[in-house]
């Protein structure tokens, strides 16, 4: 029984991030434990980030507060719906309110690139404070918007602008959890998804308490963005935590240098970081004491042949080389992930817009329930990525997207509709997280912010094409028939397979070349040390 318990504990412990690794021992604000800091960042992401994505409740609040009610006069009033049928007063008000989502999303993805650039240049604390300033301004302007002070447009400009700007700095905490970056990314991604519930909570409070719309908005501005700005001031560092790749060479080199099989080809593995501070902790110790017994001499020989982490950190041959942004961005791998992320955006957005045309009422209701629960498979995918890597999971998700639309083609069957909902539920669970993890594990950490920002900008803006596919093509040209667009998207998903397989091959080759470079430098260092000892 004790052996079984010990075995179970060992397996659970193996799933935990490495605590002995130098990267896990980096300094945190006020020396806060890294797990406590993670919980703080999770609450931070939950309270703010992309709250406007809870659009159903958000738009209901806008209608009820009378936003754009001033346009329902004259001819526009003639298009008013029957009383009690809808939330809006006239069709023009509905159009104006719905346009706010597109405005916010365009600002959101445009500012993603700006946020990424600032994250790499100015630092995480300044970026977080800027983002929360945008968020606070958005809700304050919304609180006072009305016929005499029409500030609803700038409110949603700031709301979109602050979404990624405020939350990007929290992603850098993954550098404190070497070997578990995907799980930590997925955890933060789940919290960002849960922030979509904020408008629902605010709407429920407003309707149940009877307080004014102004009080709801100001109250959230204080309890959300302003509180998170205080958290950012104290708990988000000025300088980003050092990336895993800053130390991967010296840590992996230590394993190779001190391994009896160092002469054999090393396996390509994802290497964790090592601490630059180790460079001041000493060099190789060579004993000059000749008054030793034979066993002592043999032990001393073994010790002097070992190469320590501090030696490797000191050695200039293991210092991380600086690379330019263009050398990372203008590559097949980066082009591939941007293209894949864009296709994911089309698949996800069109399904959500057109679901009412190919799902029965019960299946559509199931979709509404499952969508917020997509945080659950998000965490599971994070564990799987840590085990098998990001590319197999991306290929798996592309297959899940394919199955989603295959079931849509067969939507005459109610069973196929429910399978479609289940597949889509899994597909959207790790929508942005998969891109973050791929960039973090493939490219130089010095450009992490810029790379995810540009990818979000490209994928986000091009995902707006789904509005054309649904509004102009499906509704306008095809009279509501979704099949032609669904088949076209199926073809696009299938065409992604050769690109993704080529990306996997290219990425594996890149990792192998990095390992071979480390191996050659280790052997060079060992030879130099042997010559010095002789």
Swiss-Prot record:
TM helices/strands, residue ranges: 35-55, 99-119, 126-146, 154-174, 182-202, 216-236, 329-349, 365-385, 388-408, 419-439, 451-471, 483-503
Annotated protein name in UniProt: Arginine transporter 1
Record GO terms (molecular function): L-arginine transmembrane transporter activity
Locations listed in the record: Cell membrane
Chemical reaction(s) catalysed: L-arginine(in) = L-arginine(out)
Induction per the UniProt record: Up-regulated in response to low concentrations of arginine in the environment. Up-regulated in response to high concentrations of lysine in the environment.
Region called Disordered, residue ranges: 261-302
Function according to Swiss-Prot or TrEMBL: Selective L-arginine transporter that is essential for parasite survival and virulence. Does not require other inorganic ions such as sodium, chloride, potassium or calcium.
Gene behind this protein: NPT1
Alphabetized UniProt keyword annotations: Amino-acid transport, Cell membrane, Glycoprotein, Membrane, Transmembrane, Transmembrane helix, Transport
Keyword Signal: no
pH dependence statement: Optimum pH is 5-8.
Sugar-modified residues: 246
GO biological process, one term: L-arginine import across plasma membrane
Composition-biased stretches (Basic and acidic residues): 289-302
Family, per entry: Belongs to the SLC43A transporter (TC 2.A.1.44) family.
Phenotype seen when the gene is deleted: Impaired parasite growth under conditions of restricted arginine availability. Does not cause toxoplasmosis in mice.
Keyword Aminoacyl-tRNA synthetase: no
Membrane topology: Multi-pass membrane protein
Organism: Toxoplasma gondii (strain ATCC 50611 / Me49)
């Amino acid at each position: 029984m004790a052996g079984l318990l010990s075995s179970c504990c060992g397996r659970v412990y193996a799933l935990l991030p490495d605590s002995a690794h130098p990267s896990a021992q980096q300094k945190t604000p006020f020396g806060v434990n890294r797990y406590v800091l993670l919980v703080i960042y999770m609450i931070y992401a939950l309270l703010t980030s992309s709250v406007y994505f809870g659009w159903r409740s958000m738009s209901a609040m806008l209608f009820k507060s009378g936003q754009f009610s001033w346009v329902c006069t004259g001819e526009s009033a003639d298009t008013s719906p029957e009383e009690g049928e809808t939330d809006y007063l006239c069709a023009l008000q509905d159009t104006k309110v719905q346009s706010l989502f597109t405005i916010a999303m365009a600002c959101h993805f445009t500012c993603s690139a700006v946020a990424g650039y600032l994250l790499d240049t100015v630092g995480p604390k300044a970026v977080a404070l800027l983002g929360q300033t945008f968020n606070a301004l958005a809700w304050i302007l919304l609180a006072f918007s009305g016929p005499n002070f029409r500030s609803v447009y700038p409110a949603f400009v700031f709301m979109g602008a602050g979404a990624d700007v405020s939350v990007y700095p929290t992603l850098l905490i993954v550098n404190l959890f070497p070997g578990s970056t995907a799980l930590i990314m997925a955890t933060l991604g789940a919290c960002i998804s849960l922030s979509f519930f904020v408008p629902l909570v605010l709407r429920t409070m407003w309707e149940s308490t009877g307080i004014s719309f102004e009080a709801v908005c100001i109250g959230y501005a204080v309890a959300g963005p302003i509180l998170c700005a205080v958290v950012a001031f104290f708990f988000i560092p000025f300088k980003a935590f050092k990336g895993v790749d800053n130390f991967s060479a010296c840590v992996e080199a230590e394993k190779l240098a001190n391994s009896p099989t160092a002469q054999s080809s090393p396996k390509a593995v994802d290497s964790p970081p090592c601490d630059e501070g180790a460079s001041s902790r000493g060099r190789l110790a060579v004993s000059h004491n000749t008054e030793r017994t034979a066993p002592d001499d043999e032990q001393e020989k073994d010790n002097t042949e070992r190469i320590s982490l501090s030696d490797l950190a000191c050695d200039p041959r293991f210092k991380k080389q600086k690379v330019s942004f263009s050398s990372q961005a203008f590559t097949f791998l980066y082009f591939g992930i941007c293209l894949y992320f864009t296709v994911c955006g089309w698949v996800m957005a069109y399904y959500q817009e057109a679901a009412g045309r190919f799902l029965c009422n019960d299946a559509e209701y199931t979709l509404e329930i499952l969508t917020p629960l997509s945080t659950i498979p998000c965490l599971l995918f994070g564990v799987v990525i840590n085990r098998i890597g990001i590319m197999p999971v991306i290929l798996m998700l592309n297959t899940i997207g394919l199955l989603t639309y295959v079931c849509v083609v067969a939507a005459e069957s109610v069973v196929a509709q429910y399978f479609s909902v289940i597949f889509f539920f899994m597909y959207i669970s790790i929508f942005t997280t998969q891109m973050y993890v791929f960039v973090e594990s493939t490219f130089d950490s010095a450009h992490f912010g810029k790379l995810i920002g540009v990818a979000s900008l490209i994928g986000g803006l091009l995902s707006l094409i789904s509005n054309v596919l649904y509004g102009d093509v499906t509704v306008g040209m095809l009279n509501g028939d979704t099949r032609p667009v669904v088949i076209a998207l199926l073809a696009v998903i299938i065409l992604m397979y050769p690109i993704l397989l080529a990306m996997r091959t290219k990425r594996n080759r890149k990792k192998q070349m990095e390992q071979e470079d480390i191996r050659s430098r280790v052997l060079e260092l060992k030879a130099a040390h042997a010559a010095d000892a002789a």
